[in-house]
């Protein structure tokens, strides 16, 4: 098939867009800000502020959902929960009924009172600096702040100095909130036997005495003492030794209602304002075919450039792309004929070859690669269209062959051998919301098992059963998914610091996977944890295909894999290697996931105000190769990975891992977080996305790739799930989305004020 486009109109349209864009950029700083909208008089704004307990770790929505619901039941219709996180409306199941609640908050997992040294990434992020960075107290102007903070200070050995840090935080809050506003400062609960940081309850008792003292010192400044410690029984009310379970959060919701109700009855609630947010820009100008000299007109000069390029080969890849007039992937004589015919007026439009997407062929695996010490270092981002032997991809079939080679490269150099399940016999058993996966290795007779947790939607609205999100851990906004008709099955492990049963999170290589496939001396016996965790997700999928899907009314053909942090890396790997998975959706995956090793954002400053964040945020430290090769993380990879002296030795970079998901029948949905996520390097994830896009464009399935960079939160947040399911519903089921899906083709890093010129240059030497 052939299709036509009118060249003149294309150029005119481009010029209109370019002029408009230039005008909007040049005048943006001169335009007055939009007037802020006032909420109804009498509205009382409440900001839940704190760490992961405020966030709701272990039971999405935490105490906030209960407080919101109890306020509704008491008839308080003039209360608005506020904060930069969450959304205006969410729902949960309470006493057999679906209950709506206000999900806005300012809770951040792992945060301390102020920035402190320590933690997994070398720095513990502070609530004070986060509020200052986004100017959130002035933006949301809360009448009441429910402040619970300090668990991470104590558990990380920072009890000393906590009183002074509390003073700094309270001074900032009181200076920036309404003068008659109240801060309810609460104690923190004890830790259970499995709590992080060991037995810290002695220090917690000391810290809680400080809370009482500080609240008393600030009593004249509208700071009120609260005592959550008295509400939570660590032996009964904790889900994981740190975070409350549903019953514990319910107790907290009731307690907070009791504490604030007197103020609610006495207050008329001052009139407040909400901030406005500018819209994001696009990701750059479009290519004009035939305009080889870049002057936005097509003349005989372009024909001269094309003739020289066809004779001597094109030196500039962007010129070569503009010369591919029929868009068949090659600049050739047929393109020159069309160009000359257009210039002399013989034709008024170019004829473009319709791209057809063919089914992927299967290639035999080959691991005949050079040793690490034979690889040449290069600062350039590797061209995905060049084979290891230097030959070029010249057709779609060539690409599928190259994709197979890249897959083998990742096994050989980074993650270890992919175990495809052909030697596994998988059975399952279901009890309530728990599923046990039993695996027998056929060749040895060895057996192993691990557990998963099932979350089912109340109503299945998709034909063929509910789509299923397969999570590397709990805490992936399950209730948002189920409210959209999606099932969620996760490993029975809490959050990003609790390892699944398939492999321990260390370099010991123990767990269900290694019981069946012991770590050995040969490279093909050295499968790392990321592959092992991925193997477990694949066995869950086996169980679904083997009968569990029918029992649960789930459609296993509509599966999505996700996870955060190290499990974001694992989700990237799982989606790359198990082609049965319909969509891969890794979050905050960083180096070793979907962030380029070769791109650093250290020292770069960005404006995140369009996301409700800081207008001047500077990245301080990215996750380096050395960290991944350290003792605590080297178990994620294979032995050969430890041989690399620097990232410039890699014959691939992580845009090529993402490119393993390029498939006519599959999708990649990348999730990132831009603020307070220096370590996982969201700007580099954006660069990797731009690199991947060359592959999807070449194959002709550009809309099978998407990205969502949320403001903050080292997590799969509700926003991500909402956008993910709309994207999936549209592409897989044809359900029209409420959002504009074009938003998922850009990010805050594409805005003119944030754009790095590297985005336009790093792929300029690539074939396509």
UniProtKB/Swiss-Prot annotation:
Q: Tell me where it mainly resides.
A: secreted
Q: Which residues form the active site?
A: 68 (nucleophile), 240 (for acetylxylan esterase activity), 243 (for acetylxylan esterase activity), 565 (nucleophile)
Q: For the region Disordered, what residue ranges are annotated?
A: 267-289
Biological-process GO terms, alphabetical: xylan catabolic process
Instruction: Name the reaction it catalyses.
Output: Deacetylation of xylans and xylo-oligosaccharides; a 4-O-methyl-alpha-D-glucuronosyl ester derivative + H2O = 4-O-methyl-alpha-D-glucuronate derivative + an alcohol + H(+)
Which ranges belong to the motif GXSYXG catalytic site motif? 563-568
Give every Dockerin domain span.
285-352
State where the protein is found: Secreted
**Spans traversing the lipid bilayer:** none
Chain segments carrying region Glucuronoyl esterase: 353-768
**Annotated substrate binding sites:** 569, 633, 679
Q: Which domain of life is it from?
A: Bacteria
InterPro entries linked: AB_hydrolase_fold, Dockerin_1_rpt, Dockerin_dom, Dockerin_dom_sf, Ester_Hydrolysis_Enzymes, GCE-like_dom, GDSL, SGNH_hydro_sf
Q: What are the boundaries of the signal sequence? A: 1-40
Q: Which terms does the record give in the GO molecular function aspect?
A: acetylxylan esterase activity; hydrolase activity, hydrolyzing O-glycosyl compounds; lysophospholipase activity
Q: Cite the residue spans of the region called Acetylxylan esterase.
A: 41-264
* Protein family per UniProt: In the N-terminal section; belongs to the carbohydrate esterase 3 (CE3) family. In the C-terminal section; belongs to the carbohydrate esterase 15 (CE15) family.
Question: Which protein are we looking at?
Answer: Multidomain esterase
């Amino acid at each position: 098939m052939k299709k036509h486009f009118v060249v003149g109109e294309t150029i005119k349209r481009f010029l209109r867009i370019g002029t408009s864009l230039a005008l909007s950029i040049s005048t943006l700083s001169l335009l007055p800000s939009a007037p802020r909208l006032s909420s109804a008089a009498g509205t009382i704004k409440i900001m839940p502020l704190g760490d992961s307990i405020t966030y709701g770790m272990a039971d999405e929505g935490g105490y906030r959902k209960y407080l919101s619901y109890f306020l509704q039941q008491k008839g308080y219709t003039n209360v608005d929960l506020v904060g930069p996180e969450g959304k205006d409306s969410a729902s949960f199941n309470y006493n057999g009924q679906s209950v709506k609640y206000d999900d806005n908050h300012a809770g951040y997992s792992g945060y301390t009172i102020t920035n402190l040294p320590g933690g997994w990434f070398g720095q513990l992020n502070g609530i004070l600096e986060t509020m200052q960075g986004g100017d959130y107290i002035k933006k949301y102007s809360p009448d009441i702040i429910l402040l619970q903070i300090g668990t991470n200070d104590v558990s990380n050995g920072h009890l000393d100095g906590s009183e002074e840090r509390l003073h700094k935080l309270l001074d900032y809050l009181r200076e920036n909130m309404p003068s008659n506003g109240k801060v309810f400062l609460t104690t923190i609960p004890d830790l259970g036997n499995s709590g992080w940081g060991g037995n810290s309850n002695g220090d917690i008792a000391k810290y809680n005495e400080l809370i009482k003292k500080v609240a008393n010192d600030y009593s004249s400044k509208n700071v009120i003492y609260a005592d959550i410690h008295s509400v939570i029984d660590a032996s009964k009310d904790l889900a994981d030794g740190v975070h409350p379970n549903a019953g514990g959060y319910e107790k907290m919701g009731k307690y907070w209602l009791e504490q604030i109700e007197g103020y609610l009855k006495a207050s008329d609630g001052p009139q407040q304002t909400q901030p406005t947010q500018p819209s994001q820009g696009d990701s750059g100008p479009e290519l004009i075919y035939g305009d080889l000299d870049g002057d936005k007109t097509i003349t005989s000069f372009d024909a001269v450039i094309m003739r020289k390029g066809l004779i001597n080969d094109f030196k500039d890849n962007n010129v070569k792309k503009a010369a591919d007039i029929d868009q068949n992937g090659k600049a050739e004589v047929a393109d020159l004929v069309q160009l000359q015919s257009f210039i002399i007026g013989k034709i008024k439009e170019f004829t473009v070859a319709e791209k057809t997407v063919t089914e992927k062929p299967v290639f035999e695996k080959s691991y005949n690669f050079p040793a690490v010490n034979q690889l040449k270092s290069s600062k350039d981002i590797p061209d995905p269209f060049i084979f290891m032997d230097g030959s070029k991809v010249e057709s779609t079939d060539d690409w599928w062959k190259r994709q197979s080679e890249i897959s083998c490269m990742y096994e050989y150099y980074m993650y270890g051998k992919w175990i495809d399940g052909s030697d596994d016999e998988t059975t399952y058993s279901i009890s309530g919301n728990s599923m046990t996966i039993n695996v027998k290795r056929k060749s040895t007779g060895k057996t192993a098992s691990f557990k998963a947790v099932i979350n089912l939607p109340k109503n299945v609205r998709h034909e063929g059963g509910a789509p299923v999100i397969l999570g590397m851990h709990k805490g992936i906004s399950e209730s948002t998914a189920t409210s959209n008709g999606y099932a969620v099955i996760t490993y029975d492990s809490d959050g990003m610091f609790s390892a699944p049963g398939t492999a321990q999170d260390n370099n010991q290589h123990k767990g269900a996977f290694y019981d069946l496939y012991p770590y050995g001396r040969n490279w093909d016996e050295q499968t790392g944890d990321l592959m092992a965790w991925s193997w477990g997700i694949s066995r869950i999928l086996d169980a679904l295909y083997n009968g569990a899907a029918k029992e649960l009314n789930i459609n296993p053909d509509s599966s999505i894999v996700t996870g955060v942090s190290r499990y974001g890396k694992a989700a990237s790997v799982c989606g790359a290697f198990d082609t049965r998975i319909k969509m891969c959706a890794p979050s905050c995956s960083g180096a070793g996931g979907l962030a380029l090793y070769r791109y650093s954002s250290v020292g770069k400053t960005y404006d995140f105000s369009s996301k409700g964040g800081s207008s001047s945020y500077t990245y301080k430290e990215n996750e380096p190769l050395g960290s991944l090769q350290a003792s605590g993380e080297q178990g994620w990879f294979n032995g050969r990975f430890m041989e690399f002296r620097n990232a410039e030795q890699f014959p691939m970079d992580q845009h090529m891992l993402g490119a393993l998901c390029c498939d006519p029948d599959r999708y990649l949905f990348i999730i990132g977080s831009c603020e307070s996520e220096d370590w996982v390097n969201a700007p580099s994830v954006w660069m990797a996305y731009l690199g991947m896009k060359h592959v999807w464009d070449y194959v002709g399935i550009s809309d099978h790739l998407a990205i969502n960079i949320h403001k903050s939160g080292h997590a799969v947040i509700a926003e991500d799930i909402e956008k993910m399911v709309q994207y999936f519903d549209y592409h897989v089921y044809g359900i029209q989305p409420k959002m504009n899906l074009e938003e998922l083709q850009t990010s805050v890093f594409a805005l003119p004020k944030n754009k790095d010129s590297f985005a336009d240059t790093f792929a300029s030497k690539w074939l396509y």
